[in-house]
């Protein structure tokens, strides 16, 4: 869960998000070293009265500032490509959920069940219970079993939306007429919040996403109750 004045990412709740955090730290270290080196060179050039007679024509310097940036880009690109392939992998999902974006709410359908689906609307501020979060709570949460591979199919009924949950490392466009898919595994129980991340009209800010990860036996009890109420 994000908090005021937060400078970093939310705590990772999926293996993909953990990889993204590691990659962020890796890239940030490289950027810090480059910035330090450039700042040192600028200060050294400005503060000295000496002049290097080879500064305008030096094959060694030409080779260094050609090869070194290429090596740095490779060190950034290889981990990035690994994570991209990891995010695209969908292996034997235990559960498939279809999320549809509407103006301005989400609807969910558990396709492995015959009649398990619901609409998810934001809870108005005046109806919030103590301890609930303004603009982030939904009347129906998307409940998933913890530590289980989940495939989610994402589309939209009207305009372009985007289904995003930062703690899970997920952001996928919901495009009318097109079915996108991604997968995730929740690494711990909890409630994870997200929002529509594509401007989609007047009430774009009022499309929260709430994913609740629970133990498998709790999920089975929840799904049974939902099917009875259907």
Curated annotation (Swiss-Prot):
GO terms for biological process: ATP synthesis coupled electron transport. Cu cation A2 binds at residues 196, 198, 200, 204. Its cofactor is Cu cation. Component of the cytochrome c oxidase (complex IV, CIV), a multisubunit enzyme composed of 14 subunits. The complex is composed of a catalytic core of 3 subunits MT-CO1, MT-CO2 and MT-CO3, encoded in the mitochondrial DNA, and 11 supernumerary subunits COX4I, COX5A, COX5B, COX6A, COX6B, COX6C, COX7A, COX7B, COX7C, COX8 and NDUFA4, which are encoded in the nuclear genome. It is an enzyme of class 7 (translocase). Residues 46-59 are mitochondrial matrix. Keywords: Copper, Electron transport, Magnesium, Membrane, Metal-binding, Mitochondrion, Mitochondrion inner membrane, Respiratory chain, Translocase, Transmembrane, Transmembrane helix, Transport. This is Cytochrome c oxidase subunit 2. Its EC number is 7.1.1.9. GO terms for cellular component: mitochondrial inner membrane; respiratory chain complex IV. InterPro entries: CcO_II, CcO_II-like_C, CcO_II_C, Copper_CuA, Cupredoxin, Cyt_c_oxidase_su2, Cyt_c_oxidase_su2_TM_dom, Cyt_c_oxidase_su2_TM_sf. It catalyses: 4 Fe(II)-[cytochrome c] + O2 + 8 H(+)(in) = 4 Fe(III)-[cytochrome c] + 2 H2O + 4 H(+)(out). It holds the Pfam family COX2. It is a multi-pass membrane protein. It is found in: Mitochondrion inner membrane. Cu cation A1 binds at residues 161, 196, 200, 207. It comes from Gadus morhua (Atlantic cod).
